[in-house]
Curated annotation (Swiss-Prot):
Function: Essential component of the cytosolic iron-sulfur (Fe/S) protein assembly machinery. Required for the maturation of extramitochondrial Fe/S proteins.
Name of the protein: Cytosolic iron-sulfur protein assembly protein 1
Protein family (similarity comment): Belongs to the WD repeat CIA1 family.
PROSITE patterns: WD_REPEATS_1 (PS00678), WD_REPEATS_2 (PS50082), WD_REPEATS_REGION (PS50294)
Assembly and interaction partners: Interacts with NAR1.
WD repeats by residue range: 12-53, 56-95, 105-144, 151-190, 195-236, 248-286, 292-330
Biological processes, Gene Ontology terms: iron-sulfur cluster assembly; tRNA wobble uridine modification
Location in the cell: Cytoplasm; Nucleus
Any Pfam family: WD40
Keyword Repeat (UniProt): yes
Annotated keywords: Cytoplasm, Nucleus, Repeat, WD repeat
UniProt superkingdom: Eukaryota
Organism encoding this protein: Saccharomyces cerevisiae (strain ATCC 204508 / S288c)
Length: 330
């Protein structure tokens, strides 16, 4: 089994870290204290470079997401709004971001934000049981709601887009994952993934080109892998649970991340960071580490590319971001 080794620990907040996202060497983080902090992650340098205006939101920052291949950032808040931030061009080359727009529409806390792979759709989800899809242009200044999806029966915790297709997954307190697709400018639920016995906190798509698989993490302490069977009938897709990953977690699984390296990472309330590998069609534990944030719960995990290596980042209730390397056993 491989080992998980701490590279760097950054104390960013006094309160819990809910979310972060990585793009172009910058890690954006969101916390209960309403602040969005940006960290430069390059070589052996992990430096706080900006703190965005906390007056933009009245409550916690629950989710952050970079627009693909740009310096545009979306942040969803418990105050029911979404803020859009853009990098300011400065003569002294300092990294600063300005508030570009505030998006309103949800009736309750915004739990998740996610950009489509082309950057022209922004999905948001909320405690109001709905998923909204917003359309924007290249500037990212104006947003039009083109669809409100209301088929979940409970709080929607998370949204994620397929890495290459206009396919959206939403995870909910109603114990399901729903798959959404655009048919003739009308977004429809094309599949309901049933199997978890508790809240589904997050999901993530396989990054392999041309592959349609999804992993999900739940209150029932399991991580599941789902596969699209390629059969559409009456605008419906068949997805099946392909695997339940090895039993590592003893409490809720809050976040899962499927890396470009094919590995799946999961974190949760038990403070364990687990990494899984698929070998000849069977999923095995590749590495695991307990107490990654001491006694605190872990809310988010991401794969990052650093110096040509793939590393992991985790964020917890302790307000700390930890960076980890994976080392295979000799």
């Amino acid at each position: 089994m491989a080992s998980i080794n701490l590279i760097k620990s950054l104390k960013l907040y006094k309160e819990k870290i809910w979310s972060f996202d990585f793009s172009q060497g910058i890690l954006a983080t969101g916390s209960t204290d309403r602040k969005i902090k940006l960290v430069s992650v390059k070589y052996d340098d992990f430096t706080l470079i900006d703190v965005l205006d906390e007056t933009a939101h009245k409550k916690a920052i629950r989710s952050v997401a970079w627009r693909p291949h740009t310096s545009l950032l979306a942040a969803g808040s418990f105050d029911s709004t979404v803020s859009i931030w853009a990098k300011e061009e400065s003569a002294d080359r300092t990294f600063e971001m300005d508030l570009l727009a505030i998006i309103e529409g949800h009736e309750n806390e915004v739990k998740g934000v996610a950009w489509s792979n082309d950057g022209y759709y922004l999905a948001t989800c909320s405690r109001d049981k709905s998923v909204w899809i917003w359309e924007t242009d290249e500037s990212g200044e104006e947003y039009e709601c083109i669809s409100v999806l209301q088929e979940h029966s409970q709080d929607v915790k998370h949204v994620i887009w397929h890495p290459s297709e206009a396919l959206l997954a939403s995870s909910s307190y109603d114990d399901t994952v729903r798959i959404w697709k655009d048919y003739d400018d009308d977004w429809e639920c094309v599949a309901v993934l049933n199997g978890h016995e508790g809240t589904v906190w997050s999901s993530d798509f396989d990054k392999t080109e041309g592959v349609f698989r999804l992993c999900s993490g739940s209150d029932d302490s399991t991580v599941r892998v789902w596969k699209y069977m390629g059969d559409d009938e009456d605008d419906q897709q068949e997805w099946v649970c392909e695997a339940i990953l090895p039993d590592v977690h003893k409490r809720q699984v809050y976040n899962v991340a499927w890396g470009f390296n094919g590995l799946i990472a999961s974190v949760g309330a038990d403070g364990v960071l687990a990494v899984y590998e698929e070998v000849d069609g069977e999923w095995k534990v590749f590495a695991k580490r307990a107490l990654c944030h001491g006694v605190y719960e872990i809310n988010v995990v991401k794969w990052l590319e650093l110096n040509g290596k793939t590393i992991l980042a985790t964020g917890g209730d302790d307000g700390i971001v930890n960076f980890w390397s994976l080392e295979k056993a000799a």
